[in-house]
Amino acid sequence: MIADALTVCIVVLSRLMYRKGIDLLLTAIPRLCAKHPDLHFVVGGDGPKFVELEQMREKHMLQDRVELVGAVRQSDVRAHLTRGHIFLNTSLTEAFGTSIIEATCAGLYVVTTRVGGIPELLPPSMMRLAEPCDDAIVRETDAAIAYVRAGRHDPLKQHRVVARMYSWDATVRRLEAVYARAMLTPPRSTTERFRRYADAGGPIGGKIICMVIAVQIMLVMVLDWLVPTSSLSLAP
């Protein structure tokens, strides 16, 4: 079990902007530091919210507990991540959290907002999901700190699992499966496609979308007449 006196380090690596949920971080950090006197933050990244983080640190007198390292070069990402025990992500939108994969591969336990494709990235045992609000982030981070302190987190085991999940071989297999499913989907007729466009856009927007698509189809027909597809060399 990790001794209670050991400082727990939470790492943040993000573009410091609104979309990345830095406003949530500005609220969560003082609350977490007040609850855990032995907590330390290392925040990497640059952006328009950097000044606000500095102001928050000064307001709550956390200069010795919140380290703002600025922009982190790609070659230094691993060194930045391995300074901590927990990785905190507060994004408001995220399609695929590359930084989360990097953090788990570096052995960090993850606390992240439940947005976009993040819930599908990793097994529940490797991360805690929070709704994008400061109360939920503080609550899940509290739980993560307790989890790490109890010695239940195994960084080396986690690294091995993630390395297998996101190896090139595994990634290629999943990508091939996506293409295979797409190829099995029967092509839609032009009429059906226009009907779907009209339904999606509503009474006015649907008509505009259909007009734009019709112009695009006519443009393709003209280009195909000028440069027939049969005259093009296809890639192997």
Task: Name each region found by the language model.
Residues R164, D169-P236:
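C-terminal amphipathic helix plus adjacent low-complexity
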Residues L92:
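Aromatic "clamp/platform" in nucleotide-sugar-dependent glycosyltransferases that forms part
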